[in-house]
Design a protein with these regions (language model features):
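A short, polar/proline- and glycine-enriched secondary-structure boundary/capping micro-motif
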Residues: 36-38, 65-69, 145-146
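Acidic, metal-coordinating catalytic segment for phosphate/diphosphate chemistry
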Residues: 2-44, 50
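Conserved hydrophobic "DFG−1" position in protein kinase catalytic cores
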Residues: 17, 47, 56, 125-126, ...
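Short, surface-exposed loop/turn motifs that are enriched in glycine and acidic residues
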Residues: 76-82
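Active-site segment of metal-dependent pyrophosphate-handling enzymes
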Residues: 37, 41, 61, 83-85, ...
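A glycine-rich, hydrophobic loop/mini-helix early in the fold
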Residues: 42-76
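Nudix hydrolase/Nudix homology domain
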Residues: 28-31, 80, 107-177
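Short glycine-enriched loop/turn motifs at secondary-structure junctions
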Residues: 9, 71-73, 134-138
Length: 177
């Protein structure tokens, strides 16, 4: 995912501000949401190819949040009035440079870095059987990794913290822990 961050879209984009139960309280510009650390919604999409490999990328160095870090999810902030599902499809299509992707919702959790950022994270999975043309503003480099390769890279590469947490929860969810 591209990690939801202050730089992942226009700061004047209007998003839903939500409460601890993920209920909409009001709308606000993204700049206000980040400035005041308001709880909001984000989507994460784990994209696999037909061989089960996972789209993994390095964020551009121009990103304000986790520049140059790696991620095994694509995604971003949910717009005001937008459903999690619609946002997951929109973000996956934008970041991968594709059309017609279908995502499957898996689980939701509240991410917090313990300091400043906090958001509801809706995790989806998708399979893509075709070429990708990743968005140059978001993706500096990409590859497709097996789960074993990804788990190995998690110990040697810098990964975005929310993507790391979403991957941990994904593995737990899948094994029923």
């Amino acid at each position: 995912m591209t990690t939801p961050s202050p730089d992942s879209g226009p700061l004047d984009e209007i998003v839903d501000v939500v409460d601890e139960h993920d209920r909409v309280l009001r709308t606000a510009p993204r700049s206000e949401v980040y400035r005041d650390n308001l709880l909001h919604r984000c989507v994460f999409v784990l994209v696999r190819d037909p061989q089960g490999r996972i789209f993994t990328h390095r964020r551009t160095d121009t990103k304000a949040f986790a520049p140059g870090a790696h991620d095994c999810f694509v995604g971003g902030v949910v717009g005001a009035g937008e459903s999690y599902l619609d946002a997951a499809v929109r973000e996956a299509e934008e970041e991968l440079g594709v059309t017609g992707i279908r995502t499957r919702p898996l689980f939701r959790f509240r991410y917090t870095d313990g300091e400043r950022f906090s958001w509801w994270s809706d995790v989806h999975e998708a399979e893509w059987d075709g070429p990708v043309d990743p968005q140059a503003e978001e993706v500096a480099w990409y590859t497709w990794l097996t789960e074993d390769e990804l788990n190995d890279r998690l110990t040697t590469w810098e990964f975005v913290p929310d993507g790391r947490e979403a991957w941990r929860r994904y593995l737990e969810q899948r094994t029923g822990r």
